[in-house]
Amino acid sequence: MKKIYYKNHLIKKKWSQVFLKDQNVIDTIVKTINPKKHQKILEIGPGLGALTKQILNIADLDSLILIERDSNLVNRLVQMFNKKINILHQDIMTTNFFDLSHKVGQKLRLIGNLPYNIATELIVYLFQYTNVIYDMHFMFQKEVATRLYANPNKKEYGRLSIITQYHCKVVPLLTIPATSFFPIPKVESMVMRLLPHTNTPYPIVNIGKLSSLTKLAFRQRRKTLRNSLSTFFNETEITQKGINPALRAENITINQYCTLANMLNNK
């Protein structure tokens, strides 16, 4: 397999490494994030520091926290930014954000161009830390991004839409052409803002029940609820909650799923 380099860095395909190179796009993203000097900003997967450099220039931060697992990139970043960054050489999926927030004494603002291969898994992982996250600005593959903010009755609407919107207000901000990256990916990307709810609009007793329920419902999404959820409920129970059991998983609102999750928790 042919080796590909970007600015003398050997790109690791196994980690889905792509590098943002369009300065106009970089400027627009950072202006949209609007970083402030007093804020604690953490960048996930900074790569070669395209966003890092611009954020430090715009916000004049005392320190920017970076999490990077690629040791070659860690060394490059240290050389580039020296004392302006606090870089953590570790896997983001093992990072304890409660500890990080406690150390800096405030909620964190998270940013990053997320690797395509872990974007969905990472977002779900971060939801356990929403109490210590102020907001998140991430670049996603467009297909993933549209699933995050999809509404019922749309083909993109699914379990990820429900879990994401349960935890956060989701705002699509920018569409980024594939040519803004190297290597050029096959799809466009989108910058999304995820703002954790301070008061959830979806009251629920046990989030685990919502997770189990939606996993079952969307496993065979073309089945009607009377069939897909028969493990948990009979048809009468679904009807008693004002939900038509002849509907399919993609027709059910988040509020309705929360109602069913609460009923399941009481069983």
UniProtKB/Swiss-Prot annotation:
Catalytic activity, EC: 2.1.1.182
GO cellular-component term (any): cytosol
Catalyzed reactions: adenosine(1518)/adenosine(1519) in 16S rRNA + 4 S-adenosyl-L-methionine = N(6)-dimethyladenosine(1518)/N(6)-dimethyladenosine(1519) in 16S rRNA + 4 S-adenosyl-L-homocysteine + 4 H(+)
Broad class of the protein's primary localization: cytoplasm
Places the protein is found: Cytoplasm
Family matches, as Pfam families: RrnaAD (PF00398)
Recorded superkingdom: Bacteria
Keyword entries, A-Z: Cytoplasm, Methyltransferase, RNA-binding, rRNA processing, S-adenosyl-L-methionine, Transferase
Ligand binding (S-adenosyl-L-methionine): L20, G45, E68, D91, N113
GO molecular function: 16S rRNA (adenine(1518)-N(6)/adenine(1519)-N(6))-dimethyltransferase activity; RNA binding
Family: Belongs to the class I-like SAM-binding methyltransferase superfamily. rRNA adenine N(6)-methyltransferase family. RsmA subfamily.
PANTHER family: DIMETHYLADENOSINE TRANSFERASE, DIMETHYLADENOSINE TRANSFERASE-RELATED
NCBIfam families the record matches: ksgA (TIGR00755)
The protein's role, per its UniProt record: Specifically dimethylates two adjacent adenosines (A1518 and A1519) in the loop of a conserved hairpin near the 3'-end of 16S rRNA in the 30S particle. May play a critical role in biogenesis of 30S subunits.
Protein name (record): Ribosomal RNA small subunit methyltransferase A
Organism from which the protein derives: Blochmanniella pennsylvanica (strain BPEN)
Gene transcribed to yield this protein: rsmA
